[in-house]
Amino acid sequence: MRLRTVKLAILDTSVYIENFRTGRFTQQIAESPFLFRGISVVMHELLRGARAPIEREFALELAANLRMYTLTERIWLDSGALTARLAAAKDYEKRKVQELSFDVLIALTARAIGATVITLNRQDFEDIQQYRRFQLMCWE
């Protein structure tokens, strides 16, 4: 009997928010060949942006039902250095640097666990890929 290799994926916050609001990716997620994992930074972003009780419940339910990964010290340190390099290279404003720092944390965590990042935010993740290779899938 041949064993199938399981492919891991992390859905970026942008995918969760869009699917929560519109249901646009429900079928795509259900039929995906990936085994989805959660990471603490995505849960942080979802909870930080939750305004209504149903949004908070959604984020907490995700955290309870996904196998969660927490960022390591090495990822935090690498993320700081990488975000600074990107900010300098692209001449980003302070707010953009703050937003990008979460995407860098997501990318580096996915890389560390061998997962694919699935996002709607193509440009920022492709910019990150210029400095660190990781698997990326962009949904439209």
PLM segments and residue spans:
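Acidic, PIN/NYN-like endoribonuclease modules and their adjacent C-terminal/linker elements
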Residues: 1-8, 107, 111-140
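Short, well-structured N-terminal submotif of metal-dependent ribonuclease cores
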Residues: 1-42, 47-66
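Active-site neighborhoods of divalent-metal-dependent phosphate/nucleic-acid chemistry enzymes
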Residues: 3, 68-120
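Histidine- and aromatic-rich ligand-binding microenvironments
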Residues: 11-12, 38-39, 98-100, 121-122, ...
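Alpha-helix capping/helix-boundary segments
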Residues: 15-16, 42, 75, 106, ...
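Residue-level signal for well-ordered alpha-helical positions
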Residues: 22-23, 49, 82, 128-131
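Short, hinge-like loop/turn segments at secondary-structure boundaries
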Residues: 53-57, 86-87, 134-138
